[in-house]
Amino acid sequence: MAVPRWAVRDLTQISSARELSLRLEQARNDFRATVGSICYFNASARTPGQFDDEYIMTDQSLTYVYADGVTAQSCAMNRLLPSSSSNFGAAATAIPPWLLDPPRLNRLLREGTDEGGLVNYYEGPHKNAFFLAIMRSCIFVRPGADEINGVSYDFFARSGNYTEQAEEEEEEEEEEEEEEVLDREFQLGNLVSYPIIAWGSCPNSA
């Protein structure tokens, strides 16, 4: 089913790692109970009333997209996913927000991204002081993993943020009206409509 009016959980006032873990798990369970086992969320540009091919299977653990406070708040309020690299759009990781201090997390995030995204981790640890908790859609890929204290944490990437789709559709010379829609999507490539389950600040950033 499509995402109804899911209220993004604001966890910015929680400083305890244990409480944050519990609240995130509750948000994950509530999200699945609200939307069901499969979730379509982007309206089709071609077929009114239908959805595109991107979907989320909700029987999965949370993944985290890290950002600065202003970007995280804006994305949470508007249900948007920010890009963090020019080569594949949005980067996400299974590393939970309480596990590492900001400088160490920043070093790991820089290893999997470049300086071309809306969120540029190369500007410093403040760029990963907040998080967006999400579930991965079907177009996320797993390019690698990070090992921390003997535990492997997967690193994921969402390809393109509509940039590749827009280029392909232009090459196919679609009708003028459709091209205008795709042009707008191309210009908004650093942000893509996406279900955000919760957002907050990293306890070690306080």
UniProtKB/Swiss-Prot annotation:
Annotated InterPro entries: Glycosidase (IPR006064)
Superkingdom, natural source: Bacteria
Keyword list, A-Z: Crown gall tumor, Plasmid
Bias (Acidic residues) ranges: 165-182
Region Disordered, annotated ranges: 162-182
Biological role stated in the UniProt entry: Involved in tumor formation and increases auxin and cytokinin effects in host plants.
Record's protein name: Protein 6b
